[in-house]
């Protein structure tokens, strides 16, 4: 699943992880980057950064909520991504304990939508960005990520059985520097490893 010459979608493209993935993808000569996020101002900042540094790169910027199935299906129908990095999620532990329904809607329903559409539109590879603590969840955010992981795993098994055309992977990212100064891995390094999963599996 080489990136060069391919249409690559990044959900959550305006977040810290998504934005770094976008930066690194831009250096790998994709045919088109499809950037999806519901935060319009940060997404516009990403668009400006790309236009400043990669003037010849074809970029589609789409304001959308991954939990909106109808909107996401229209985006897949129009853009036909070949590779997806699914980074869109709520990640704040304390806030998601206060707004559990939002964690469920975005982290679970949003991931269900992306996984289903990846299979329907025969995307070559989907990489879900999860959280290290999803292994032993203790709060709403971590439980929502774990449920989303299980859905992606089951979708991967089903697609391998039925079509063999879409591979799905999960990458669990922990705390990274400079967000957490006690970490031994930087955000850039974490995203580089994530891209390697997208390319090599």
Predicted regions and their residues:
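Conserved sequence/active-site signature of Rossmann-fold short-chain dehydrogenase/reductase
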Residues: 67, 134, 176-178
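Conserved Rossmann-fold NAD(P)-dependent oxidoreductase catalytic core, especially the SDR/UDP-sugar
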Residues: 80, 86, 90-146, 154, ...
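N-terminal Rossmann/SDR dinucleotide-binding element
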Residues: 1-80
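Feature representing long, continuous alpha-helical segments
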Residues: 15, 70, 112, 146, ...
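Short acidic, glycine/proline-enriched helix-loop-strand junctions
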Residues: 45-59, 83, 121, 144-146, ...
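Conserved beta-loop-beta element that borders a ligand/cofactor-binding pocket
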Residues: 125, 152-178, 182
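Alpha-helical substrate-binding/gating segment
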Residues: 181-201
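Alpha-helix termini
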Residues: 51-54, 156-163, 201
């Amino acid at each position: 699943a080489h990136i060069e010459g391919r249409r690559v979608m990044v959900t959550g493209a305006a977040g810290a992880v998504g934005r770094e993935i976008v930066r690194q993808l831009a250096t790998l000569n994709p045919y088109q980057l499809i950037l999806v996020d519901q935060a319009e101002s940060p997404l516009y900042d990403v668009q400006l950064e790309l236009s400043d540094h990669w003037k010849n790169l074809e970029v589609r910027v789409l304001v959308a909520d991954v939990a909106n199935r109808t909107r996401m299906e229209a985006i897949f129908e129009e853009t036909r991504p070949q590779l997806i990095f699914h980074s869109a999620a709520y990640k704040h532990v304390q806030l998601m304990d206060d707004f559990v329904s939002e964690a469920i809607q975005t982290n679970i329903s949003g991931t269900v939508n992306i996984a289903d559409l990846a299979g329907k539109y025969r995307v070559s590879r989907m990489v879900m960005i999860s959280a290290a603590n999803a292994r032993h969840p203790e709060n709403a955010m971590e439980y929502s990520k774990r449920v989303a992981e299980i859905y992606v795993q089951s979708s991967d098994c089903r697609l391998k059985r039925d079509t063999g055309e879409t591979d799905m992977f999960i990458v669990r990212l922990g705390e990274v520097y400079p967000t957490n100064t006690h970490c031994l891995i930087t955000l850039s390094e974490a995203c580089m490893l994530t891209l390697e999963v997208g390319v090599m599996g």
